[in-house]
Amino acid sequence: MKHLIPLIVMASVVLAVYADRGYGGGRRGGGYGGGGYGGGGYGGGGGGYGGGVGGGRGGGGGLGGGRGGGGGVIDGKDDVGLGGGGYGGGLGGGQGGGGGLGGGQGGGGGLGGGRGGGGYGGGGGGYGGGKYGGGKYGGK
């Protein structure tokens, strides 16, 4: 059992590096909360398709896991009010926060974690997080 721990740690680091580079998924939150279905694969969250100022749910899937929350000031049909919410899963897991003009924080947890969100756009976490989950206008 002890010899498995270093292997798990090394694999986590490698995957986190690839995730931060956007491997298998978008790094950008996108516009004012809209734009594309981000995420997927190892790269994790980002994107969102709800439109509006705070809007939409983040992408996700694969090992990156998770769906970002988000409120949607204009289009909130698929969301959980202004406070956001959402849920995750997979190795990257975590919850996406956000919502409203203030955005908030994306999820995290799992082996990599990290924070998305912030600014107008919100965003997701994903496996290994990533530096580009937030930003004033939903991601850079």
UniProtKB/Swiss-Prot annotation:
Keywords: Amidation, Antibiotic, Antimicrobial, Immunity, Innate immunity, Secreted, Signal
Name of the protein: Ctenidin-1
Tissue: Expressed in hemocytes (at protein level).
Subcellular location: Secreted
GO annotations of cellular component type: extracellular region
Family of the protein in this entry: Belongs to the glycine-rich peptide family.
Extra facts: The peptide Ctenidin-2 corresponds to the shorter peptide indicated as conflict in the feature table.
Keyword Transmembrane helix applies: no
Residues recorded as bearing Glycine amide in the entry: 138
Primary location group: secreted
Function according to Swiss-Prot or TrEMBL: Antimicrobial protein with bacteriostatic activity against the Gram-negative bacterium E.coli, and very weak activity against the Gram-positive bacterium S.aureus. Lacks activity against the yeast C.albicans.
Position of the signal peptide: 1-19
GO BP terms, alphabetized: defense response to Gram-negative bacterium; defense response to Gram-positive bacterium; innate immune response
